[in-house]
Amino acid sequence: YPWFGKDIRQGIELALENYALLHRLWREEFVDWSGRFRTPLQGFQSTPRPLDGVAPFVWHGSIRSPEIAEQAAYYGDGFFHNNIFWPISHTKQMVELYRRRYEHYGHGSADQAIVGLGGQFFARANSQDAVNEFRPYFDNAPVYGHGPSLEDFSAQTPLTVGSPQQIIDRYMTMREHVGDYQRQLFLIDHAGLPRKTVLEQIEILGTEIVPVLRRELDALRPAHVPDAPTHAARVAARDAALAAADEPAYDDAYRFGTGDNWTGLTAEGGQRAQEQSLARDRRNQARLADSPA
């Protein structure tokens, strides 16, 4: 924070204000804005515009700040709980808060909220081999060492050291505490592991752990619980909404000619843009007039 002239003690306020502005910049062509932490904007257009005119799906990450869970719920965005150093009881509390508020803001039922979790593991074919190999790294790593034992830390956090099946079994239980969730991230290059070992762990994850977790968790997920949104799905939803509202289809063509070297406008291009803007205003006014008081 100090590198950018900010006070880390205002981290939450910065996160809330900055994202509120970013959310508007992605969705509005021209923005007038003022806030606490940066200079005001007047008629500002951010470029480049979002791909296909659709803002990316955003995950809000938090360890222990309920304000970030609230922020994710307010916008209907995803909530990622960075839980790798926390007991499952804390993770459950944070995710439940997000789910309740997601439903409160009208984005869907609580179990349809988009959730991600962290995790970490070390695996070998034989569980005792995994423990024996990982323990020296754990005991001497600054982030772990000289604190709880490997066994105590593993009991209190998602860290799982053992066979691939033990890791699968441990992470299958996460659903029992937080409900169906859409993303599971794993920390692999931790505790000072050498590159060769990290690559071996990635291989085990991709071939022996993830395929089983994906298959088993997908089979348990009810039909009404969605996957995490993809860009293609968000574009399709936007297009369907435009069609349902009898609005013109999205056009990503550059709307201005390039005749004027200063403004990039030609008279024809500027007039066309003005006509499009007026047409949008008329449609908005008509919808307001048709809305119940």
PLM regions with names:
Residues 1-293:
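Active-site-adjacent structural elements that line small-molecule/cofactor binding pockets in enzymes
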